[in-house]
């Protein structure tokens, strides 16, 4: 695996390229509001507490379901049906990603444990100022 990252003048990641596939992020302040990855396009909307609330994936809106700690535990379609479910251990290591859209939306949308951005390719969480390895609890 090869990975390259690009950061803006504020030190925030605006692009990652893994094995030749570029993912580009558009930021509003520190929040990712738009993302393209290969042929996928995602728009993100946030709640009053500045946590991810809605993702529009390739033109279709989905709602995030969060635990009290802010973990993204599910994604719902417009009818309230669960299309993706996530599970984590106590330190945020992914345990499962299931559902009818698990292999598409479930993998490409980045918000997971505590609402942090998860990189499927590296297994690391991007916390803006550092990366977090849930397998090592640091």
Name what the model sees in each region.
Residues 59-128, 134:
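A motif-centric feature for acidic-aromatic and gly/ser/thr-rich catalytic loops and repeats
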Residues 8, 17, 26-28, 36, ...:
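Residue-level detector of conserved, well-ordered beta-strand and adjacent loop positions
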Residues 3-12, 22-31, 42-51, 62-70, ...:
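Aromatic-rich beta-strand edge motifs centered on tyrosine
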Residues 1, 15-20, 34-39, 54-59, ...:
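Beta-turn initiation residues at beta-strand->coil junctions
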Residues 41-56, 104, 109-112:
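Short, positively charged
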Residues 32-36, 48-55, 117-125:
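Phosphate-binding glycine-rich loops and adjacent basic patches that engage nucleotide phosphates
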């Amino acid at each position: 695996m090869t990975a390259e990252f690009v950061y803006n003048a504020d030190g925030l990641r605006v692009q990652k390229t893994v094995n030749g596939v570029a993912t580009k992020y558009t930021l509003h302040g520190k929040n990712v509001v738009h993302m393209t990855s290969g042929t996928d396009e995602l728009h993100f909307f946030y709640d009053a507490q500045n946590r991810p609330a809605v993702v529009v994936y390739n033109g279709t809106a989905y709602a995030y379901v969060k635990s009290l700690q802010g973990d993204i535990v599910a994604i719902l379609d417009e009818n309230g049906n669960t299309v993706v479910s996530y599970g984590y251990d106590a330190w945020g290591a992914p345990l499962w990603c299931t559902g009818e859209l698990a292999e598409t939306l479930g993998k490409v949308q980045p918000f997971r444990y505590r609402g942090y951005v998860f990189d499927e390719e590296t297994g690391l969480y991007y916390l803006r100022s550092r990366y977090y390895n849930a397998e090592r609890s640091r």
